[in-house]
């Protein structure tokens, strides 16, 4: 293993005018709080880079590694359905692009790195609370198999940062194949610079959709893949019970990654209209609205791409979104029920169960995990005691067991399949809050313990991580402030 990773700078070299070069602004008395050891190993990084005793170094923006060329990218976007103009990157700096030994290229993005020319009225900082939440969420989603940016390190400090209250400044090193957002394209479309839209699209195709690079119709084919990836991501969110909270177009990844973890939340009680962001007064980004918002955001991206793709082709590709969404959602939800063969009427079993869960406020994650224990030849179910309306549950469960018998699968094999898609553990807000409170005392032990559990969310476990949330943790409100 080399002493230092190798960095290249394709964004800087190939896209002049898309960024401003600058270096991070360090925090006061910054120090490394935690690092993601499995990710560090995948990135071929030596352990000597992670020094918990000395200065924060590269993790706190105090030094740069050889080959790094730090810059802030420029992008715009729609926020809560309204064009907001230029938005960022107001506190994040792309330090460089790491070239791995297998040829893979990954961004190193330092969040909370200080003011940039795109900071608007912001202070360029992130607080410890939000960096811990993003660190945990990105690794939780990765553990669930959902496309996401990753988190490598958290640095804490003695720098005070004002939000609703005064909090501790922090930085997070985010790793991703790309940080290109829908809003990057919108920025140049609204600036009436269609040649820049084409230039950026060509860059994205060459670096991230190389199989399309030689196609004459490459721009349309690429947009079609973005539509499909976005539809599949929305389906995955719905199936695991994840609410993003702030699906503005500048928070949408061109690669179909979950990114920009802010006021997110995983469902506790199954509430289809769950709103995790307490500043989302109209419920625009409520849980059950997310698939529709995904399409709306794609329509905004299509508008930005209209200088390089004919309108009729864009509309035809957008029409593929709903079928792709329903296919992926249906595939994943059938697996959650233990159905490996698609049959007419399968959606009825799901709709009836979800209706009962919504009426009774059943815990989303626990219900499907307990359903995984079903024995098709037994009328008894541990899930029965979770419902007040047991007559309705009994009637549904009898039909469900009959449907399972049609699968012809032994209980053990089916239960293994169901447990591989129905997690025992998700990152509930109260679990994150407990880790945050410890981290604010410079104690990373709960953060490390929770992180280890989130890496294996499908494993059988019986501890406080899988119990119902306590009363104080059931309806925690989360805001956009970070």
Curated annotation (Swiss-Prot):
It catalyses: L-seryl-[protein] + ATP = 3-O-(5'-adenylyl)-L-seryl-[protein] + diphosphate; L-threonyl-[protein] + ATP = 3-O-(5'-adenylyl)-L-threonyl-[protein] + diphosphate; L-tyrosyl-[protein] + ATP = O-(5'-adenylyl)-L-tyrosyl-[protein] + diphosphate; L-histidyl-[protein] + UTP = N(tele)-(5'-uridylyl)-L-histidyl-[protein] + diphosphate. Keywords: ATP-binding, Magnesium, Manganese, Metal-binding, Nucleotide-binding, Nucleotidyltransferase, Transferase. GO terms for molecular function: AMPylase activity; ATP binding; magnesium ion binding. The keyword Cytoplasm does not apply. Its EC number is 2.7.7.-, 2.7.7.108. Pfam families: SelO. Mg(2+) binds at residues 251, 260. The keyword Metal-binding applies. The active site is at 250 (proton acceptor). Belongs to the SELO family. Nucleotidyltransferase involved in the post-translational modification of proteins. It can catalyze the addition of adenosine monophosphate (AMP) or uridine monophosphate (UMP) to a protein, resulting in modifications known as AMPylation and UMPylation. NCBIfam families: adnlytase_SelO, PRK00029.1. This is Protein nucleotidyltransferase YdiU.
